[in-house]
């Protein structure tokens, strides 16, 4: 019998082992769809971004006009721009759900996969941040100024670091140029780290909702999960296209319709919705350095999660107390997101401080305690 090229060709063999003949657990639910959705989001963002970059000018006097020109005069430029801007939102929705799945089902116990995932999240956040500055609207400019200025709180080297990042004494032309270079580069870095992420995942194989070994019952990825992923993709693209075509500016800031002006500060400086939870945590601490440390901790805390797992069971499927706590954490993050969008005044200040405190308390103290308690209740 002639050898199957899919299994013998050096390149196709790799694709085959990753996407076609990959042995997958037979019982993974729709929560396992988000990995492939993230891959599609990345490809969509790279494609639309590349098309936008061909019409964009990274210069403070031309950036705003070049984006407006793209939307008005380039064939389907408005569509490409709307897909790119809202694609970022869907990218973050998918990554948050993907992380939530990992937390709920104990996927973080695959430490290498989890750690590369956290690095991917940080890189994605950096990419989205520098990208938000490029249209050079009011919120772009002031967002860049406020967030980069936080680094000046780092003792001894802070101010030097910020001026080095800006390329001057304020956010100006050199800043915009380097942010464009970074925004162009980082998605390809994300693609590279994604390959590493998948390599680590395929070392162990996927986890499943029961948290037990699935070696006794595996099915090929294609056709089962390839078709399931296509269904997930269709279900994601419906709200994505609805948003991009019917209300493309819903998640944007109206301030960005005004070109950047260093002499006029917007009344409420706030980032895009997907950074609001972290922004609320920064603002809840009156000290600048404390705020920066809390900001870093709010995301880096994910790296500690494998070490805070005290339960004898991997997933939360059969742990009702941990489940309740998980949803309290989700509600807490939604409250933080809401607080981040509100002005710094009573009662939002105290609500933000309580939500920030409970966020760290739940993850660092309550989760391990509940896990230990459940072990005792089940006589483990």
UniProtKB/Swiss-Prot annotation:
Q: Where does a ubiquinone bind?
A: 202
- Keyword Transmembrane on entry: yes
| Gene3D superfamilies assigned | Cytochrome Bc1 Complex, Chain C (1.20.810.10)
The membrane topology term of the UniProt record is: Multi-pass membrane protein
What GO cellular component entries does it have? mitochondrial inner membrane; respiratory chain complex III
- Positions with a binding annotation for heme b b562: 84, 183
Its recorded name reads: Cytochrome b
